[in-house]
Regions:
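Acidic, surface-exposed loops and disordered segments
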Residues: 1-171
């Protein structure tokens, strides 16, 4: 199987991590992969907040209902919608930042890291709390918090393909 397809199937949500620091080079590669994602009108609305401060990670964990992983690193993917057209602001930043997030998750998997994507936007109380913790400026909206670390659990590669979910030419 082609390596890129294999990597997609190997990417799984990991919620248990080793107590091991992630190398700066791997963090940078993940961010480079994220920023290689396609965007509407090449707008590139993303901002990435890399968090390795244990206090801030703990605050993020306690602010998000499903974010209980004890990871040594969190990357918050945000959309910078300040001063952009309504079309981009209202519609495309979420898609653009989601594409960047998936690239980052795949890169992490290829680097031997585990990740779990915890949604922030559009839950108002999550957006408000994460914005406060990270001191985000007006116009920068947190989309998600990606917990990253060396996996302390193994999950088999899989696809969730269901033929009945595929429709050709019409529903």
């Amino acid at each position: 199987m082609e390596q890129s397809i294999k990597l997609i199937f190997e990417r799984r949500s990991i919620r248990k991590f080793q107590d091991k620091k992630i190398e700066e080079e791997k963090i940078e590669l993940m961010l480079k992969a994220a920023m290689a994602a396609p965007t509407a009108m090449n707008y590139q609305p993303w901002e990435f907040v890399v968090i390795n401060d244990e206090t801030k990670i703990s605050q993020i964990r306690s602010s998000l209902t499903f974010a209980k992983s004890l990871a040594p690193l969190v990357i918050c993917v945000c959309g910078n919608v300040g001063g952009v057209s309504r079309l981009v602001k209202d519609r495309f930043w979420v898609q653009d930042c989601s594409a960047a997030t998936e690239n980052m998750l795949l890169a992490a998997t290829g680097l031997g890291l585990g990740t779990v994507w915890c949604g922030v936007y559009p839950i108002t109380m999550y957006v408000k709390r994460i914005s406060e913790i990270l001191q985000l400026p007006t116009g920068v909206i947190p989309l998600n918090a990606i917990f990253v670390g060396y996996p302390a659990e193994e999950k088999e590669a899989r696809t969730q393909y269901k033929a009945e979910k595929v429709h050709f030419n019409s529903y």
